[in-house]
């Protein structure tokens, strides 16, 4: 893990395609470790052909070699693959109580586009993994619930992402205009999810996005 962090730190210092002057103390401070550990890590990375290190007097120049770049790319690919599997882990939180109103307004369209009559309310989940709602669904094509005008008020489009939570099919809904921060997912379902799954604030939940 420390070698991976070292390569990431070097890449952030632009040691790609050219040698960059870096002090051992800078690396030690950045990685919150000792200069001795930094020297050992650099020696190991050099022995593995991941970096090239040159010393001129008291100056140290380091470059990530193609093998090191391939190693970093492989890690990025694995992380991207993990994030694209559509698994979301979050924590149940209380909402502002406005979900019921909006679900009622969109109810006929939700039935038409998602195939179920929604319970008038949403389950709010604070995303713990991945970082935001959009990160969780970035590779998923949403169901677009079209906006409409009612009693002179405009209701915008809503993006819906079908999910399974505790064996119940529902959907994450992302309104075109929302007051929720990007780490809060609003989930609708045919039932009251809090009651059906016996959930309370702080409970950990797992959602699987249906692709």
UniProtKB/Swiss-Prot annotation:
Protein residues bound to CDP: 95-100, 191-194
GO biological process: FMN biosynthetic process; regulation of DNA-templated transcription; riboflavin biosynthetic process
Organism: Thermococcus kodakarensis (strain ATCC BAA-918 / JCM 12380 / KOD1)
Region of interest: H-T-H motif-like: 1-85
Pathway: Cofactor biosynthesis; FMN biosynthesis; FMN from riboflavin (CTP route): step 1/1
Binding residues for Mg(2+): 122, 124
EC number: 2.7.1.161
Function: Catalyzes the CTP-dependent phosphorylation of riboflavin (vitamin B2) to form flavin mononucleotide (FMN).
Region (Riboflavin kinase): 86-211
Residues binding FMN, per UniProt: 178, 186
InterPro entries given in the database record: HTH_CRP, RibK_CTP-dep, Riboflavin_kinase_archaeal, Riboflavin_kinase_CTP-dep, Riboflavin_kinase_dom_sf, WH-like_DNA-bd_sf, WH_DNA-bd_sf
Catalytic function, reaction form: riboflavin + CTP = CDP + FMN + H(+)
Names of the cofactor(s): Mg(2+)
Positions of transmembrane segments: none
Protein name: Riboflavin kinase
The keyword Repeat appears for this protein: no
Family: Belongs to the archaeal riboflavin kinase family.
Molecular-function GO terms, alphabetical: DNA binding; magnesium ion binding; nucleotide binding; riboflavin kinase activity
Record text on cofactor binding: Binds 1 Mg(2+) ion per subunit.
Keywords on record: Flavoprotein, FMN, Kinase, Magnesium, Metal-binding, Nucleotide-binding, Transferase
PROSITE patterns the record matches: HTH_CRP_2 (PS51063)
